Swiss-Prot record:
Organism this protein belongs to: Bos taurus (Bovine)
SMART domains according to UniProt: ZnF_C2H2
Annotated crosslink Glycyl lysine isopeptide (Lys-Gly) (interchain with G-Cter in SUMO2) location: 5, 185
InterPro entries: Ikaros_C2H2-ZF, Znf_C2H2_sf, Znf_C2H2_type
PROSITE patterns: ZINC_FINGER_C2H2_1 (PS00028), ZINC_FINGER_C2H2_2 (PS50157)
Record-level GO BP terms: regulation of transcription by RNA polymerase II
GO molecular function: chromatin binding; DNA-binding transcription factor activity; RNA polymerase II cis-regulatory region sequence-specific DNA binding; zinc ion binding
Source species taxonomy: Eukaryota, Metazoa, Chordata, Craniata, Vertebrata
Entry function: Transcriptional repressor that binds the core 5'GNNTGTNG-3' DNA consensus sequence. Involved in megakaryocyte differentiation.
Keywords: DNA-binding, Isopeptide bond, Metal-binding, Nucleus, Repeat, Repressor, Transcription, Transcription regulation, Ubl conjugation, Zinc, Zinc-finger
Identification of the protein by name: Zinc finger protein Pegasus
Length: 419
């Protein structure tokens, strides 16, 4: 019977060692500094229990599933977080929990030595001290606004620029690069009806925007090789800094782009200097196409009948130079950017690869403006602008134009005053 007496001592000792190991493990996870002190205290208590026999210290252990065990005077949950005694808030570190408890107790230990300001959070005091020093480390990337608090900067972005930061893990852009993209898109709103096409002869160049490099993996329909081939012909790549040179990204803006080009052409009654020189006014039909319809449009434009005289096809231009390029009509000279047959008695050049013959009706033609459209939607929008009785009368405001150039300039200005 006397040999069974040490069993309670062994049980208490083993249980205390278990509590010591668990406490030390939890303190390492939470980053608490006082874990070593409690481990030493529990080990000392275990030694005293061995010396005093059955008079071991009482260990308070809570078996409630919602509360966990008591550590550092705070209840700890089973996932290792410290729990607030006033509410259900839980934190991994004691510093955060102490700051939270000050909300309940009303304690404000962080005081300003220049004014009566006091706060329960040290970071709030640091932001307050910037009001005395005048320091404004936070700057808006879209304008010259600066402030001393990050929350004021976020409020400024939402109120002034109507921008909300993108949340989630879908975007792989950094914050500075994302705000740079938003800045470019904001400038597009003010100049959306301006043209990007450069009218300097002999080629028309469309530069590639910088932000397309970041979103190419999300928009597979955009063919970046065409932009890159055109960007090589320009002195500088990327989006131009001039806000007047912006990308045309929808059918309405493409119509405005065409009208802006026609408005800059010389008058219709201008005579050419020589029979071999054709004025740029005869380069009137323009191809309005989208990147997804490039293959169909190029095949159709190459198969259109131009003249009854024998002609030889010119070499096919690079794929990237066909965007927004003039397409020769039934009575116009072939352009440098198309693969249409050449007029006159010219020597045969290197033949282009044979293209599949497509139905010419796929290319929509406006007989009033002598323009060709590869997109049915764009063609419908354009034809809806013509009047029923007078084709050069605006169908929106009723303004009567002289000719197709005046009609195109009227829609480029966008001033539809009801008469």
């Amino acid at each position: 019977m006397g040999e069974k007496k040490p069993e309670p001592l062994d049980f208490v000792k083993d249980f205390q060692e278990y509590l010591t190991q668990q406490t030390h493990h939890v303190n390492m996870i939470s980053g608490s500094v006082s874990g070593d002190k409690e481990a030493e205290a529990l080990q000392g208590a275990g030694t005293d229990g061995d010396q005093n026999g059955l008079d071991h210290p009482s260990v308070e252990v809570s078996l409630d599933e919602n509360s966990g065990m008591l550590v550092d005077g705070f209840e700890r949950t089973f996932d290792g977080k410290l729990k607030c005694r006033y509410c259900n808030y839980a934190s991994k570190g004691t510093a955060r929990l102490i700051e939270h408890i000050r909300i309940h107790t009303g304690e404000k230990p962080h005081r300003c030595h220049l004014c009566p300001f006091a706060s329960a959070y040290e970071r709030h005091l640091e932001a307050h001290m910037r009001s005395h020093t005048g320091e404004k480390p936070y700057k808006c990337e879209l304008c010259s606004f600066r402030c001393s608090d990050r929350s004021n900067l976020s409020h400024h972005r939402r109120r002034k620029h109507k921008m909300v930061p993108i949340k989630g893990t879908r975007s792989s852009l950094s914050s500075k690069k994302m705000w740079g993209v938003l800045q470019k898109k904001t400038s597009n709103l003010n100049y959306s009806r301006r043209a990007l096409i450069n009218l300097s002869p002999p080629s028309m160049v469309v530069q590639k925007p910088d932000y397309l490099n970041d979103f190419t993996h999300e928009i597979p329909n955009i063919q970046t090789d065409s932009y890159e081939s055109m960007a090589k012909t320009t002195p500088t790549g990327g989006l131009p800094r001039d806000p007047q040179e912006l990308m045309v990204d929808n059918p309405l803006n493409q119509l405005s782009t065409l009208a802006g080009q026609l408005s800059s052409l010389p008058p219709e009654n201008q005579n050419p200097a020589s029979p071999d020189v054709v004025p740029c006014a005869e380069e009137k039909p323009f191809m309005m196409q989208q990147p997804s319809a490039q293959a169909v449009v190029s095949a159709v434009s190459a198969s259109l009948p131009q003249s009854s005289s024998p002609a030889s096809p010119e070499p096919r231009p690079p794929h990237g130079q066909r965007n927004y390029s003039p397409v020769a009509g039934p009575s116009s000279e072939p352009s440098a950017h198309t693969s249409t047959p050449s007029m006159g008695n010219s020597q045969p050049s290197t033949p282009a690869p044979t293209l599949p013959v497509q139905d010419p009706q796929l290319l929509h033609h406006c007989q009033h403006c002598d323009m060709y459209f590869a997109d049915n939607i764009l063609y419908t929008i354009h034809m809806g602008c013509h009047g029923y009785e007078n084709p050069f009368q605006c169908n929106i405001c009723g303004c009567k134009c002289k000719n197709k150039y005046d009609f195109a300039c009227h829609f480029a200005r966008g001033q539809h005053n009801q008469h």
